[in-house]
A protein has these predicted regions:
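Glycine-biased, small-residue-rich flexible motifs in mid-sequence functional cores and linkers
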Residues: 2-7, 87-360
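Short, small/acidic-rich helices and loops at N termini and domain boundaries
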Residues: 1-91, 321, 345-355, 359-360
Length: 360
């Protein structure tokens, strides 16, 4: 048990978060009026029922839960599974979430909790296109390599590629689940789940072993946007869970960016709609990095000779790889590698397939 004692509020908070049949709204009411889970634990059913918003049925459930809950034993079993728990009562509860209208009372996590440093949410279509995949990887990598934490939901498609890009960029990334913390969903993201836990963290407001349910995902979306300073949408249909996340972000006063797409592409309908409604048009991930004031020092380093050769022949007018190769004398393979490196540093941007411009 280490230094956990009966006086440690986390034991009572863990109990309060797990009372069957008592909803989040009631838990918030109890916390508001009582100030701590320990105080709730020490109250009788009659005292609880006299609190505003607490029904007699809820009061009885809470009272009965004390008899069935082993404070020490339950906590030991949780810790033995490698799972951590934090509540609104603890000082290490994520600061950004405290300001939400309906913050989760408790969070389960594996790995680390998100630090109070610049972060961006990256979400989008599960059945994304190859272009969407490319953008998610590129954006995630740029954010990660520039010190921006990437927040997403571990879903198929854009979410997973956003996480992967951040990991490839050597950055931290955090996944917010719509199920129990120990459930890998979708199952094919097992390896990615482990990488995220090792290089960031996995979070959920739902207790361990809770299976995924359609109703849980809209709820977790408010946490994704809540943990983010800015939200990036990469491909979304007109009716999409990503738009719910965008609504959450706007309600929370966060900046929302959307990657534009073709008018005829259903996967771009949601993003184009957001842009029409006033969302920022994301033309390069460096825009978000710049807005967060985190342009990496590596972008200020001098270029190598071959990089200068490529960069010097570019301007604001798009040039094809064939044109660049002709001007520099570089073979296509070498040129592609150099362009990728310059793009990572935010110095060039691909405007459409194999056409590039300089950025700075």
């Amino acid at each position: 048990m280490g230094n956990v004692t009966a006086e440690n509020d986390i034991l009572y908070a863990y109990w309060l978060a797990n009372i069957s049949g008592v909803g989040t709204k009631t838990i918030h009411q109890l916390y508001k009026y009582c100030g701590s889970a320990k105080t709730v634990y020490e109250m009788s059913a009659r005292e609880l029922s006299q609190l505003y918003g607490v029904t007699e049925e809820s009061a009885m459930r809470i009272s009965d839960a004390k008899k069935k809950w082993d404070l020490y034993g339950k906590w030991e079993r949780l810790v033995s599974r490698g799972i951590s728990f934090v509540s609104l009562e603890q000082p290490n509860y994520p600061k950004r979430l405290r300001h939400l209208y309906d913050p989760p009372y408790g969070l389960y996590y594996i790995g680390q909790l998100p630090p109070d440093t610049p972060s961006a949410g990256v979400v989008g279509a599960r059945n994304c296109s190859s272009y969407g995949k490319k953008m998610a990887l590129r954006i995630g990598k740029c954010l990660g390599s520039n010190g921006v934490c990437v927040i997403s939901g571990l879903a198929r498609g854009i979410d997973g590629y956003g996480h992967q890009g951040a990991l490839e960029g050597g950055g931290k990334t955090y996944a917010v689940l719509g199920c129990g913390i120990n459930i890998v969903y979708p199952p094919e993201h097992g390896a990615l789940y482990e990488q995220i836990a090792a290089q960031g963290g996995i979070l959920s407001e739902y207790p361990p072993d809770m299976p995924p349910s359609p109703g849980y995902f809209p709820m977790r979306n408010r946490i994704i946007s809540g943990l983010s300073d800015a939200l990036i949408i990469i491909e979304a249909k007109q009716k999409s869970g990503s738009l719910i996340t965008a609504d959450c972000a706007l309600e929370q006063g966060k900046d929302v960016y959307a990657v534009p797409g073709r008018m005829t592409d259903p996967l771009s309908a949601g993003c184009n709609h957001l842009i029409r409604q006033g969302a920022g048009i994301l033309l390069s991930p460096e825009e978000v990095v710049s807005e967060l004031g985190l342009l990496s020092e590596k972008n200020k380093l001098p270029l190598e000779k071959s990089q200068r050769l490529v960069y010097s022949c570019l301007d604001l007018h798009p040039k094809s790889m064939e044109e660049i190769s002709g001007e520099t004398g570089l073979d296509p393979v070498t040129l592609a590698q150099l362009l990728d490196g310059l793009e990572e540093r935010g110095l060039v941007r691909e405007t459409w397939q194999n056409h590039y411009i300089s950025v700075n």
